[in-house]
UniProtKB/Swiss-Prot annotation:
Coiled-coil positions: none
Species of provenance: Zea mays
Keyword Plastid part of the UniProt annotation: yes
Keywords in alphabetical order: Chloroplast, Membrane, Photosynthesis, Photosystem II, Plastid, Thylakoid, Transit peptide
Annotated family: Belongs to the PsbQ family.
Location of this chain's protein in the cell: Plastid, Chloroplast thylakoid membrane
Protein name stated in the entry: Oxygen-evolving enhancer protein 3-2, chloroplastic
Length: 213
């Protein structure tokens, strides 16, 4: 009973031991922080902190210097493609009609022969990719150059006299047969087959180019 009365008396007076202890700790922390601030005032460490805060960041100064030295020149020239394609940015040239932007354009026979020779050389240049076994690149480049060859050879054959068309058609048929075999070898990732049909394709290209003159 006496303990209960003592507890009630403490509560009525607003005394809480935990709260009193917390206030004491807060006071100690405040006093200690104040003492730390008094000891730092005017010291060398505080001088360095003030100097760092007042100076501009180093990255900002470097960035400002870099901006001053940047020189903007003229835009680069359009990158060139195969002869007759004008440039590789043709599909993004909005001044051209859609048909001219996304489809191969017919060329005069003389220019078609020139592009046939360029495409043939590009196919011959696939040998390093075959040696490296870069099969996706072999297939992509081979199909692209073969599409140019097929299109331009049709133009050239159509311009030839009747007696020359038959022999030229036979040579081109043999050429595209070996190109298909080379494409299949690249698809199967077979190095021996790819080397075999690359040699056959190279010979067939030589026969066609010799016929064109």
């Amino acid at each position: 009973m006496a303990q209960a009365m003592a507890s009630m008396t403490g509560l009525s007076q607003g005394v809480c031991p935990a709260a009193a202890d917390s206030r004491t700790r807060t006071a100690v922390v405040v006093v200690r922080a104040s003492a730390e601030g008094d000891r730092c005032a005017g010291g060398p460490r505080c001088d360095r902190l003030v100097a760092t805060a007042s100076s501009p960041p180093l990255s900002q100064a470097v960035h400002a210097e870099t901006v001053k030295t940047i020189k903007i020149g003229a835009p680069p020239p359009p990158s060139g493609g195969l002869p007759g394609t004008l440039n590789s940015d043709q599909t993004r040239d909005f001044d051209l009609p859609l048909k001219e932007r996304f489809y191969l354009q017919p060329l005069p026979p003389a220019e078609a022969v020139a592009r046939v020779k360029t495409s043939a050389q590009d196919i011959i240049n696939l040998k390093p990719l075959i040696d490296k076994k870069a099969w996706p690149y072999v297939q992509n480049d081979l199909r692209l150059r073969a599409s140019y060859l097929r299109y331009d050879l049709k133009t050239v054959i159509a311009s030839k006299p009747k007696e020359e068309k038959k022999s030229l058609k036979e040579l081109t048929g043999k050429l595209f047969s070996t190109i298909d075999d080379l494409d299949h070898a690249a698809k199967m990732k077979s190095t021996p087959e790819a080397e075999k049909y690359f040699a056959a394709t190279k010979d067939a290209l030589g026969d066609v180019l010799a016929k064109l003159g």
